[in-house]
Amino acid sequence: MNTPRNVIAIDRVPVSSLLGYKRIGVNKVKIDANTSWQSLPVKVPARLTINDKIDNGVRIYTAQLVFRSCEELTDLERWVYRCKTANGKYYLIGTDKRPYPVGTVTSNHPDNMTDNQLSEVTVTYTSCNQIPYIL
């Protein structure tokens, strides 16, 4: 039976404040419970896409997180993101080492009052390691 995998919450922490990062196996990590995550106000559900490809004989993993927010998120450099899915898993987008996730913001100013006016944030992260979930 498939369980829902929609992203229902997103938190972030500066890479310098990511405590106790330890990779366990291929696709799991442990993070210190004292890490101070900052909750982001997002329209649920958000979208998380994880894919892989072979580039010059090396497997590269890419995670793309897309969400809408009513707040202007201008500070997008050097953050690590934690995504909670409806099935209870937490995925970690980024680590405390380079390359860091890259974020961009699209600000919507529609000509119709009933159209979407939320900012759309896209966070992209590329790594040679699988995108892990948090234990």
Task: Label each region the model flagged.
Residues 1-64, 99-113:
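Solvent-exposed edge beta-strands and adjacent loop segments
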Residues 18-19, 40, 48, 65, ...:
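Generic detector of leucine side chains in alpha-helical contexts
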Residues 21, 61, 81, 90-91, ...:
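Sequence-level detector for tyrosine residue identity
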Residues 49-72, 115-129:
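Oligomerization/assembly interface segments of phage tail-like spikes and tubes
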Residues 70-97:
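Short, acidic/charged, Gly/Pro-enriched secondary-structure junctions
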Residues 98-135:
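Mixed-charge, glycine-accented linear interaction segment located at domain edges/termini
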